[in-house]
């Protein structure tokens, strides 16, 4: 029996860690000693969750082979059970990973004479954690690539993504081999600042600030009190700031409990202690970004204080009589007042304001890579130290004539810092979508106190961050819903547009779910909290969008490849430019008239070399894709379209074929009454009262649809009191019958009526035939053996489904419907919606096979579905789109989630991906074009014919402007509007008739 159970579970791919969560078992093994004459039994205890591994075993031909493999495996210590399937060449092993590993099991199978390869290892899946780290100090793709290489070299790291645009890293790692502390250390050793955002563990962390007169002993008492609470993992106290960090399981406890424990603690004369949630201000991404903006702004202002006088003394005052004479006054030998002023003012710009470029260069070069900081440091150093050389020579030589370039280095640094300031500001705007989502949660909430009967006994306004699971909160009109939950009292309309994009307010009544961050418009609601913190819908949306922005689009690989050799190539070109012009001048390959009066050939060559070095911009290439993806995914989230990263965006813009599931995708997903035909003169309200009283006792979906529709004719619509039904009988496959108000009521199909000799008139037969042609279910109603009415029940098409398919055709996208329903219903729905290609009676694996067939035919396929049976096809498709109202499994398998559950968003998703990708292309054209044109111009390619040259400070300004322009180009996506065709879609109305 156990073997059959294991085999069945292998087929169903259940997780054995759930079936056997923790087993404490004593295993015995024999150990031969002294020639085998004696043996001792060693018992060892294993306190370890069972893991499952599945191997493909080749070479087994019969049950004897399977038996030999099973025996060999079961001899190993730590094996709980083994099931060998010779027919399918599979071996499924349940084992304790602390006692035996999968490699030992594989070697044992091969020692038995068979070839084994691991297919699935649940231990690896369970042991993987994902942590997110914010990284400060990255300037270009070279920095992000360096950090990725560093992280991927750490033992236990399985995958690492570093996003330059949002300055974050997502690391998948095995906590048994590494830790997030080690990851932070490696990033900091690489020369960058690292701040942990989340650990990936199923715990939450909160920081509390304690106010009051505290001693070390009292802090220890608080620490012990908190550690004694169920669900608290660890408590860490920072004595300098009186801050307490608590790591806890949100399912068990919460921050309000911590504050109550702390504030209930009294230490003699110290009195009560006040605890509040600690706010560090600069921890969040937005706060950190604002701090970075302020830092660049201050640096730029200080650079102006020194650079403007340098510029004036070098470029302006030299042409003003009187001032020129003062500046040209010789102090020592050939050293002038102007040179001294420029040297003194340029030095703090070079070594104080420009210090960030030195540190950035050092960190990059220490790791064997080069970035933008290296180019800036080399270029400004060349200008500054050559200028310093001219000052020293002028001070020590009575006949030296030279020109300093202090204005070049100072202006170069000032313009680059200005560019960085504008770039950081623009990059900050690319993440505004996330900031807006995070700000949706209200600051406070009204907590209700209830007695045992559920009556409200009091209310209290609390910090919104103190809400815990199973709390009951009050939502007043005009207030935001404080947390996810369901309504236990009241009714209202809630504006969910900020989460789902749905423009119209959604009616809410008892039992309906509400989403934290949405706006209650009218009416008071009492909501029981079901999800808080990282589990909330808002937090999950934010996390999904953040993960999407971390994921690189395949086109980003182009920039990554270029960045590896870009800076070394630019340094080589810069040196070659200087050398070529220097040799040309020394060898008199160009006339001396080409040399400006204030320079010599060496200085002219140096200017060209520096210009090449500082005009090149790898940052523009690095920002081309991630900034567009950031804005695109943010805009999508605001439209109710959650796109899981750049890869999904890139694939979606190529889609030319969409496969639709029927139920819940093209249709509403639940039956409703769409038509009522009364054959006798009867009041509709009375008719439905009798029918509902009969059907309310049935659990059939069609019965529930009829009862739900009947409520519309009642004044007490929310909780109607139906007449009592006596002698209720449910006849499987036919219908129900009961006695209501002394009348015999039958509701069912033709077979039910025929069995009870109820005459079905011709017009009723026609109605049934019409219903069948329209993929509807015809239901007959008789009263006292006389047919009174015909109901048509169907799963109606979603509003605008037909128009959505038509718009897709206009976009040259082919639509196909695949469903598990019968061919009659499938063809009827397809005709109604306008789909030509239909596949019916398809199993889940057949849906996936159809997707693969379309891909083999050259189509780029998107699959749109909502159910568990759609998951294989969603995974197989180039782009999987899950209807937001569908199951969690379908949503997990998809690349794009449609929050509003309507088909219009399929069009929006594809259109947005096309617009985003065209923006990425435009960014690359600009970034590559800028470098391909700018570098030759800076090198002096136009100088021989036009005498036009690019001074280094202008080249630096152009470099800074190129990055800003790429970011601004991406920001234009924020103005995205969905296709105008979607604004004119007609809504299908449900028809109700009566005679």
Swiss-Prot record:
One cellular-component annotation, GO: membrane
Residues at the active site: 661 (4-aspartylphosphate intermediate)
PANTHER family, sorted: P-TYPE CATION-TRANSPORTING ATPASE (PTHR46594:SF4)
Protein name, entry field: Probable copper-transporting ATPase HMA5
Its biological purpose: Involved in copper import into the cell. May play a role in copper detoxification in roots.
Gene behind this protein: HMA5
Coiled-coil region list: none
Keyword Magnesium in record: yes
Cell compartment(s), UniProt: Membrane
Chain positions recorded as Mg(2+) binding sites: 866, 870
Entry's induction text: By copper.
Gene Ontology BP terms: detoxification of copper ion; response to copper ion
Lyase as UniProt keyword: no
Positions on the Extracellular side per record topology: 322-340, 389-406, 585-605, 941-952
UniProt family annotation: Belongs to the cation transport ATPase (P-type) (TC 3.A.3) family. Type IB subfamily.
Topology relative to the membrane: Multi-pass membrane protein
Any GO molecular function: ATP hydrolysis activity
Catalysed transformations (reactions): Cu(+)(in) + ATP + H2O = Cu(+)(out) + ADP + phosphate + H(+)
Cytoplasmic side: 1-299, 361-367, 428-561, 624-920, 972-995
UniProt xrefs under Pfam families: E1-E2_ATPase, HMA, Hydrolase
TM region(s), chain numbering: 300-321, 341-360, 368-388, 407-427, 562-584, 606-623, 921-940, 953-971
Keyword terms, alphabetized: ATP-binding, Copper, Copper transport, Ion transport, Magnesium, Membrane, Metal-binding, Nucleotide-binding, Repeat, Translocase, Transmembrane, Transmembrane helix, Transport
Signal peptide: none
Disruption outcome: No visible phenotype under normal growth conditions, but mutant plants are hypersensitive to copper excess.
Top-level taxon in the UniProt lineage: Eukaryota
Tissue spec. comment: Expressed in roots and flowers.
Residues involved in Cu(+) 1 binding: 62, 65
